Amino acid sequence: AASAEKFMFKLSLADVLRLTMFGTLIALLKDITRIPLHIPGHSSIFWMGILVMGKGLIPGFGSGMVMGGVSGVLAVLLGLGKEGVFVFFKYFIPGLVLDLIAPLFLYKLENPVVGALCGAIISLSKMLVNLALGLLLKLPMVFLTIGLGFTSISHTLFGAAGGAIAAFLIKRLKPRL
């Protein structure tokens, strides 16, 4: 009975702890996998994939915000990015957007097309936050030198790939959860 009690956002404590694990994984993977591909958005394949997977496994409203909030706080504490404390929003906004768009797809994130669409959309939301923070803080934005069009396409492709991979993982893991 205790595990069925709602803790936050109508999610159980066990679900919030699982989401915290996913959020931690996002920040740690971003810090550990610094692959110098020099392609904008290449980390979205991991990052957006984990967000979509967490939302697919625990579909309640707020799960994206919990994962985004946890990874954002860890990103600030680990000193990820050149935005200072504002790096939090790069992690939080994709989770918020995922919470807003998942109901439009009836939470069917185990469908590879839906997973890819959600991954692409939240990856683009991260790119827009990067752009807004760069303009607001007057940071050098290398991704603008190669063009916003290419940057948008690469974010879309990597986010979609992460979302599609997450869809297959959701199908495998959901029965075990």
Q: What is the meaning of each model-derived region?
A:
Residues 2-57, 62:
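Hydrophobic transmembrane alpha-helices
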Residues 22, 26-30, 51, 71, ...:
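Alpha-helical transmembrane segments of multipass membrane proteins
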Residues 53-59, 77-85, 100-107, 127-132:
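Juxtamembrane membrane-interface segments at transmembrane alpha-helix termini
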Residues 3-7, 11, 15, 36, ...:
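Membrane-helix interfacial "entry" motifs
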Residues 30-40, 71-101:
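Interfacial aromatic-anchored transmembrane helix boundaries in multi-pass membrane proteins
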Residues 16-21, 45, 49, 61-69, ...:
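Hydrophobic alpha-helical transmembrane segments
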Residues 108-177:
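Membrane-embedded alpha-helical hairpins and interfacial helices in multi-pass inner-membrane proteins
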